[in-house]
Amino acid sequence: MSHPAIIALTPGEPAGIGPDLTVMAAQQARDYPLVALCDPQLLKDRAKLLGLPLTVSTYIQGSAVTTSAQHISVMPIPLGAPCEAGTLDSTNAAYVIETLKQATEGCLSGEFAAVVTGPVQKSVINEAGINFSGHTEYFADNSNTPRVVMMLATEGLRVALATTHLPLKDVSAAITTASLTETLNILLADLQLKFGLSQPRVLVCGLNPHAGEGGHLGMEEIDTIIPVLEQFRARGHNLVGPLPADTLFNPKYLSDADAVLAMYHDQGLPVLKYKGFGNAVNITLGLPFIRTSVDHGTALDLAGTGKANIGSLQVALGYAQNLAMQQASINEIAG
């Protein structure tokens, strides 16, 4: 590429810690161009509240993007109403959606190489009459992507999910031959294309205790999971399992694994967040562009206090940059 790929950053809920983290991220010089999609006055006000210096420049497509310390480029998107740190206002729900819309369009057009998302308050968006179930679903719907996979990563561990935000009683029915096949196809493809792993080794959790104990503790492994894994192994993929989730997460298995596929949200993510909370990143696999996100919420009580932890945003930005560079290399090789 002739110039460094631009990373788009949506700070998320304006009353939360997303603007704080954006201001904090701008304090250090960067080796990649970063553009915040938000109201520039919001960042100026939050910087003043935090007592941090900040110069804001208007982003103009095709022009150089600042990478200097204490300086950030902003694609201006106006708030619906003035924002007070820590106080939700549904008037600003449409503003949050507009930042995501602009990020999606920029990524699809190639203007941005990746988008990093700050935390949003789903409840206040829905209270404003906007049907919104989350970033992942929004990006999938607005890029015509029929299925995506949620993966969280921290140092030494990547965990993808076969199902995401479902009640536990609905998980078994959601794990079908078709859905598990689609999940594995997306996971393996993105580990190869976006992470540069030519032959990824993936550990697959069973659904039931002891991975079903040969059918005595549930039949999902025998009826669905094992047959799907056998089909992938027959095509040369390096999949191990199904393994009992209570023993899979130890060095004996993880030392040479590239990722773990958990069957449901609270099977895999508690381990990952115990290992790396505050320094983990959420990556959406299967999209036609790169999207990473922080692993925490809006933390309204911390907004404007200077007590927010920037660790997860730093990791999310780092992942976005590395994945963008990997994608650029692949594109150059492909011609």
Swiss-Prot record:
Keywords for the protein's UniProt record, in alphabetical order: Cobalt, Cytoplasm, Magnesium, Metal-binding, NAD, NADP, Oxidoreductase, Pyridoxine biosynthesis, Zinc
Cofactor: record remark: Binds 1 divalent metal cation per subunit. Can use ions such as Zn(2+), Mg(2+) or Co(2+).
Cofactor list: Zn(2+); Mg(2+); Co(2+)
UniProt: substrate binding residues: 135-136, 273, 282, 291
Primary localization class, coarse: cytoplasm
EC number, UniProt record: 1.1.1.262
Keyword Zinc: yes
Catalysed reaction, written as an equation: 4-(phosphooxy)-L-threonine + NAD(+) = 3-amino-2-oxopropyl phosphate + CO2 + NADH
Domain of life from the UniProt record: Bacteria
One GO term of the biological process aspect: pyridoxal phosphate biosynthetic process
GO cellular component, one term: cytoplasm
Residues reported in the UniProt entry to bind a divalent metal cation: 165, 210, 265
Family per record: Belongs to the PdxA family.
Function recorded in the entry: Catalyzes the NAD(P)-dependent oxidation of 4-(phosphooxy)-L-threonine (HTP) into 2-amino-3-oxo-4-(phosphooxy)butyric acid which spontaneously decarboxylates to form 3-amino-2-oxopropyl phosphate (AHAP).
Subunit structure: Homodimer.
Record-given protein name: 4-hydroxythreonine-4-phosphate dehydrogenase
Taxonomic source organism: Saccharophagus degradans (strain 2-40 / ATCC 43961 / DSM 17024)
Taxonomic classification: Bacteria, Pseudomonadati, Pseudomonadota, Gammaproteobacteria, Cellvibrionales
